[in-house]
């Protein structure tokens, strides 16, 4: 659903004299503010805008929300038309393409000028928005993959603690596979499956990101094991064919032993799975502690006519006060250290299991993978993923699929060189 809110500050000479220098210098200004599929927070945004206008009385802020399926095309159209919103909420790796194309403002000079701002945020998450040594976004909300496991199914299969290696993960999955039940399920979009390869020492690209590095005996072995486990029912085939609703629904159905997904899945699954409580659901790290982040952050369009004002506004949005309030209302983590500490303390009292899930998001944040800063990330996925599907679903031998993927990736990299 599209929502639009315009809040205007009054123009008054006496008030203008009391305004900060940045607002006086800009005169009457307008900022466009675009968010990604979060229209349910309209009340929060109105409150934040109202507070901002208390000290920036000549500023008008127009807020617009777009669904995730609509925002990228909308933003691209606005960029081409020269009417890009000044502040934009971007998810995943899509921001890299915009940064590389010169559409986003480099925030590094602002962070260097105000070093105390960077200290507000989790450094590992903040670093995920660096491209060629420059930082382009501030954190809005954060999430990374973890391993959920069905304690009841573990007990029925004679299993105790969660798996500690890839081979154990597959072995545990096989033990739980019986009838309609399967042992393991993973999300696959936005490289969320990549930790399964990383824990086996497989790299997608060379360190300089200029050559494919995945066509190795180790990668072939991983694919062969995944294909065998999928064919035998240990791994649920929805891992390779579903996207979001289908995998979450399958795990909520109480017939899957383990689910590799990010923290956002918890509340979706909990809403559907009556069986879910602290005695039946566990949350832990995947073996090797590798995880793929899928974050939202605020960027400033380079075409912004009032970048100083936009910077002040995103500082307000991501500062301790409003990040804490957002975390409380949405029951998530923001990447703002104090806000996340407060939210964990609050949710631990209301939902201990939810707190355990969120706690994993702040652990081992030095082990991110699948988040390469590539301007051609979408094209790379389009070339690579179909061959992974072919291998794990038994359509092609692993070595053939890897060779075909390698040729496709090489062509893409040559075009992008």
What is each PLM-predicted segment?
Residues 5-25:
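N-terminal export signals
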Residues 108-121, 202-221, 271-276, 281-291, ...:
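Short, solvent-exposed loop/beta-turn-alpha elements that line the ligand-binding surface or hinge
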Residues 92-144, 170, 218, 278-283, ...:
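Hinge/lid segment of periplasmic solute-binding proteins
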Residues 27, 50, 54-55, 155-157, ...:
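Extracytoplasmic/periplasmic substrate-recognition and gating elements
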Residues 124, 278, 284, 328-383, ...:
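Long, aromatic- and glycine/proline-rich binding clefts that accommodate carbohydrate-like moieties
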Residues 95-103, 108, 112, 123-161, ...:
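Periplasmic solute-binding protein
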Residues 173-175, 211-240:
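Glycine-centered hinge/linker elements that transmit conformational signals in sensory
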Residues 47, 51-121, 152-164, 249-258, ...:
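Extracytoplasmic "Venus flytrap"/periplasmic binding protein-like
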